[in-house]
Regions:
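Extended, low-complexity, charged alpha-helical tracts
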Residues: 111-115
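N-terminal carbohydrate-binding/catalytic regions of secreted carbohydrate-active enzymes
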Residues: 79
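Conserved beta-strand in the GNAT
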Residues: 91
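Short Lys/Arg-enriched helix C-cap and helix-to-coil transition segments
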Residues: 108
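Cleavable N-terminal export/targeting peptides
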Residues: 1-45
């Protein structure tokens, strides 16, 4: 309960501050899992970093935190995750960023990763996004080829479709497929509400809201 209270206070404070900022009609990418867009000039030579932590409150199971760190320079994309494929399991990734478009902007990053810990394997994966008007689709996925037992190989995916009515707020739907914890659904569905202020993103998710809902609270920082 203390964790939920602290998160609620943080969201309230950021939301009140964000309301005081001027808004525009231009859509802003606020998804915590999005890949930084490719830009021209000197910006392409600079590193950009993003760190996030997802706190999972799973019914009839243990709570856990899933951190992710990304680093991008020019087209190069590097990423590290923990507690994503399985608990007590890390993964390291390398990929290349592609992107383009104006009214319909797109990004796509094919990746290859190594998984180590309680689960070990090789994983081809991807991240991608589409942005149009105030709508954004973000998706990522990977297939883990388990090197200990081929029967444990698995496809993981996470996708979000969100609408940003103002530049600091987004609402939408989310789906995921994971074997990190058990539910009655192979593909979990839910809703999201996110706010952004400067370099900070805060997002709340609820999966399976009609049957033993799982709550996820995410915080992200770009630098």
């Amino acid at each position: 309960m203390r964790l939920l209270a602290l998160i609620a206070v943080a969201i309230f404070l950021v939301a009140n501050t964000a309301r005081a900022q001027p808004t525009t009609n231009a859509p802003v990418s606020t998804a915590t899992n999005s890949t930084p867009a490719l830009t021209g000039g000197a910006d392409e030579k600079a590193w950009s970093f993003y760190a996030s932590a997802y706190t999972y409150l799973v019914p009839d199971s243990r709570e856990y935190v899933q951190p992710t760190f990304t680093a991008d320079r020019d087209g190069l994309h590097l990423e590290a995750r923990y507690n994503y494929e399985a608990l007590n399991t890390g993964s390291a990734w390398a990929g290349y960023n592609f992107g383009g478009g104006e009214k319909l902007a797109w990004e796509f990053t094919p990746m290859l990763g190594g998984v180590f810990g309680d689960t070990t394997g090789i994983a081809p994966g991807y991240k991608g996004s589409l942005r149009w008007w105030k709508l954004e689709l973000d998706t990522e996925g990977e297939y883990v080829f388990d090197t200990r037992s081929s029967s444990d190989s698995f496809f993981y995916t996470w996708s979000e479709l969100s609408l940003a009515p103002v530049d600091w707020l987004r609402i939408g739907a989310v789906v995921q497929r994971t074997k990190l914890y058990k539910t009655d659904f192979d593909i979990q569905r839910g809703f999201l509400v996110g706010i952004s202020f400067k370099r900070v993103d805060l997002t709340a998710y609820v999966f399976n809201p009609d049957d033993k809902p799982t709550f996820v609270f995410a915080v992200g920082l770009s630098f």
